[in-house]
């Protein structure tokens, strides 16, 4: 178990928000086999609400130059060790640098109360993931996309509608739960 400090705190400078330090396991803890085609490591970043998010970063082995990147989250109630991690690892095998993240209030990420959803905060989680990816030296900030699975598909669409840095969006979902009254 390794303590990981939030790596993207630019927006927090000058604010009264203190990032939560998360303790993340560095062992392979996924529900799917580890690929021998990608490197994996745990990372954290902070959203504008001061919540520290836990993520798994997947990078193609022997990658050269600035890569296109993808942030993946969902489905609702799931964690990055499940389907979003599998999506991220599979996309990394195809040449993308990817992160699968636990949204606020879920899994290894911070936030109280636990196991709740907030469309505003969870949309911001995607934007915080873009902040993190765009600061990585091996990422082309002009080629960043997002994938929202199931209930997070609608949140991915929300994020893409308000954040012009997102150049591609996949909503792998049967409906947009954000439009339900």
Name each region found by the language model.
Residues 17-65:
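N-terminal cap/lid segment of alpha/beta-hydrolase-fold proteins
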Residues 65-75:
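Short beta-strand element of the alpha/beta-hydrolase
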Residues 77-89, 103:
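The serine-hydrolase catalytic nucleophile loop
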Residues 90-110:
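Conserved alpha/beta-hydrolase
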Residues 116-137:
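Alpha/beta-hydrolase active-site loop
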Residues 137-150:
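Alpha/beta-hydrolase fold nucleophile elbow
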Residues 149-151, 170-179:
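Active-site nucleophile loop of the alpha/beta-hydrolase fold
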Residues 153-164:
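Short glycine-enriched nucleophile-adjacent loop
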């Amino acid at each position: 178990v390794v303590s990981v400090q939030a790596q993207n705190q630019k927006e927090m400078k000058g604010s009264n928000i203190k990032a939560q330090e998360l303790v993340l396991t560095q062992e392979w803890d996924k529900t799917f086999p580890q690929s021998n085609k990608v490197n994996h490591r745990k990372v954290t970043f902070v959203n504008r609400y001061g919540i520290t998010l836990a993520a798994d970063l997947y990078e193609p082995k022997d990658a050269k130059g600035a890569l296109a990147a993808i942030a993946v989250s969902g489905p609702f109630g799931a964690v990055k060790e499940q389907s979003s991690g599998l999506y991220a690892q599979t996309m990394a095998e195809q040449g993308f640098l990817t992160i699968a993240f636990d949204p606020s209030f879920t899994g290894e990420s911070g936030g109280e109360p636990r196991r709740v959803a907030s469309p505003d905060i969870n949309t911001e989680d995607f934007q915080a993931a873009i902040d993190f990816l765009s600061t990585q030296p091996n990422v082309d900030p002009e080629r960043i996309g997002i994938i929202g699975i199931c209930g997070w598909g609608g949140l991915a669409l929300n994020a893409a509608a308000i954040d012009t840095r997102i150049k591609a969006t996949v909503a792998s979902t049967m409906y947009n739960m954000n439009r339900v009254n």
